[in-house]
């Protein structure tokens, strides 16, 4: 068991909160066959990357003017393969627990967590209208369309951090601590580059890959992560039976 404190929590979405790997791979494979691209080669580079970056790299002839290529693919993921999408175990409970003061059991006035995803707004927002409806979309929500540089660049996480600090009136507070939850090496690297504690989830990659990327803790899923204290002074997070390199 391990415990650490944090002021703000930042979450990746696909593979961290929502299990979308099967849906995404089916949609990408379909597109690969249409354009004669080797899916296995694409999958070496697609996870955690922005859709528009993958399209530019592997489908240079596809028309992505005004992101219409991105939207077409991600609508396919959201609708054609919705039956393969599920929540990462423990995700809903963890997010809901971050909304409650552990001392008073009352809902906090402002959320201390945000989403930072490489996906498009259409796809990312859709999960909060379906399988994450009970949680509801957070105010601070950074998508792949909101940043110039995708992960492993820390731009997305840094932007979410700054917006949360502004919303929570923490801009003048020094030595704030942050935690990033991620399933992809590029996301772990982005979190570390921002100076955050990083928790890797092995939904998409082996634990060794996440440790090599710099993960401070690695878990199988979010049932191993719980909030033991949450109030105006910060958050204390407990990681139960974290995985080890051995």
Curated annotation (Swiss-Prot):
It comes from the Eukaryota. The keyword Cytoplasm does not apply. Its cofactor is Mg(2+). Mg(2+) binds at residues 83, 183. It catalyses: 2-deoxy-D-glucose 6-phosphate + H2O = 2-deoxy-D-glucose + phosphate. Substrate binds at residues 83, 92, 146-149. NCBIfam families: HAD-SF-IA-v3 (TIGR01509). Present with 752 molecules/cell in log phase SD medium. This is 2-deoxyglucose-6-phosphate phosphatase 1. It comes from Saccharomyces cerevisiae (strain ATCC 204508 / S288c). The lineage of its organism: Eukaryota, Fungi, Dikarya, Ascomycota, Saccharomycotina. The gene is DOG1.
